[in-house]
Swiss-Prot record:
Keywords linked to the UniProt accession: DNA-binding
Lineage: Eukaryota, Amoebozoa, Evosea, Eumycetozoa, Dictyostelia
Cross-referenced Pfam families: HTH_3 (PF01381)
Disulfide bonds: none
MF-aspect GO terms: DNA binding; transcription coactivator activity
Protein name: Vegetative-specific protein H7
DNA-binding region, residue intervals: 54-73
Annotated ranges, domain HTH cro/C1-type: 43-97
GO biological process, alphabetically ordered: positive regulation of transcription by RNA polymerase II
UniProt xrefs under Gene3D superfamilies: lambda repressor-like DNA-binding domains
One cellular-component annotation, GO: nucleus
Domain of life: Eukaryota
Length: 104
């Protein structure tokens, strides 16, 4: 049996320095999207009109109840997929100019 050693094996080292500094600096400039202030109210009104709890709505759109709570409190980072599911479940527009109006 012959054992061979490869040149440079085991020499993988993490280089920090400049790349790490660029990442830290770039994170400060990132602006997260925010919900339109009328969206949480529209979700609450539509859900209450359908006499649904947050838990029931979450089950209907296959999300966690905490997600509904975040959207209704306005603290959620908006996701187009979740907003689309909410629109279909509540039959109310949650994006665009006519927020809170019934879907056609």
């Amino acid at each position: 049996m012959d054992v061979q050693t490869k040149y440079g094996a085991g020499q993988n080292k993490v280089l920090g320095g400049a790349n790490q500094k660029k990442i830290v600096e770039s994170e400060e400039d990132i602006a997260l999207p925010e919900l339109n202030p009328s969206v949480p109210q529209a979700i609450q009104r539509a859900r209450n009109a359908l006499k649904m709890t947050q838990k029931e709505l979450a089950f209907k759109i296959n999300e966690r109840p905490g997600v509904i709570n975040e959207y209704e409190s306005g603290s959620a980072i908006p996701s187009q997929a979740v907003l689309s599911k909410l629109e279909k479940a509540l039959n109310v527009k949650l994006r665009g100019k006519e927020i809170g109006k019934p879907l056609k």
